């Protein structure tokens, strides 16, 4: 069933004078589906590169708090009788979790659309607006010789290296 939704992006504004920001979360409300949830950044690596000197642990703690508050609201909306009117926009809910003030975390103007999968839409918006420019983790590749050097030291220290013989294994094909 298609349902309308509204969303807002949570921005981290390091210096309100310059107005520079990085998107750090997304909250979404689909009133007819009685769905509300949020996704927030759980790492601060990119933020630390853009704004050196920020307190990463405090940031992560605050992101967990915001996301958990939206999860609590989502549970309440799904499981309780619909006695209270659900707001038509996500903004009143967003401001109930994080009020509009001049702090570093600010809600952007809301957007919206129609979806048949509010959860999937939230993930898509989060991917597009928050994690789009994140660097993929870099894994260090090592050659066979690099790996052998590490193990060789251990074998040498235990005086068992002389007992090892090379062996070539071939497949049955």
Predicted feature residues:
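Polybasic/polar functional segments that serve as interface/processing modules
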Residues: 1-173
């Amino acid at each position: 069933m298609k349902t309308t939704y509204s969303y807002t992006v949570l921005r981290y504004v390091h210096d309100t004078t310059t107005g520079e920001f990085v998107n750090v979360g997304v909250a979404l409300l689909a009133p007819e589906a009685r769905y509300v949830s949020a996704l927030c950044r759980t790492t601060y690596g990119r933020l630390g590169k853009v704004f050196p000197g920020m307190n990463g642990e405090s940031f992560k703690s605050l992101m967990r708090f915001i996301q958990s508050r939206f999860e609590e609201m989502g549970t309440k909306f799904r499981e309780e009788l619909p006695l209270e009117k659900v707001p038509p926009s996500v903004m009143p809910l967003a401001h109930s979790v994080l009020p509009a003030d001049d702090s570093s975390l600010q809600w952007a103007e809301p957007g919206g659309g129609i979806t048949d999968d509010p959860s999937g839409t939230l993930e898509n918006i989060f991917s597009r607006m928050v994690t789009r420019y994140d660097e993929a983790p870099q894994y260090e590749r090592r050659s066979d010789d690099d790996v052998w050097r590490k193990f060789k030291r251990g074998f040498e220290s235990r005086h068992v290296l002389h007992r090892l013989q090379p062996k070539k294994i071939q497949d049955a094909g």
